[in-house]
Amino acid sequence: MRLTFALCLLSLFQIRCVGKTTQCKIETTLGIIEVELYPEKAPNTVANFLKYVDAGLYANSSFFRACTPENEAERDIRIEVIQGGDLPIEKEMDPVAIETTEQTELLHKDGTLSMARDTPNSATCSFFICIGEQPSLDFGGARNPDRQGFAAFGQVTKGMDVVKKIQGQEEDDQYLIEPIKILNITRID
């Protein structure tokens, strides 16, 4: 009996020690993608993404780009991702200093949610989801010449089939001919 009680207490303690995550739902015209965000590992990047979520700014945006083995064939460093969150420039908020994968230890694996960017700390609203392992997007990776990598901050927990459906849409030079509408992105309680 004491052993059972001790094991129950230990289980409760372990549950409380697990890092806190934030859950979000990405509703698209092709289905729902659920993600968990890691604010304890990537606080600035998660806060940046949630500013857009909480303001409802992703409603009626889209997934507009899909990188595939076929349309990346000419590049030296190939990736497989879908990119979304295209907003009019007037709705973009100021970029913030975001964490690299060297700082967070969150790597670009299958289903990783990450912020798109041009130069370091230029990420605003655009994000992408990895299909398969994408080490060239991590800190030190060669996809971006500055080798700073991209800011991974979450993981798909449900809906990778939807991610792959989006990736499979007809495209022209990586840009979807008919972008897939993001109906909304909301937090899941």
Q: What function would you assign to each model-found segment?
A:
Residues 3-12:
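Sec-dependent N-terminal signal peptides
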Residues 1-4, 27:
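Intrinsically disordered, low-complexity Ser/Thr/Pro-rich tracts
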Residues 15-189:
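Cyclophilin-like peptidyl-prolyl cis-trans isomerases
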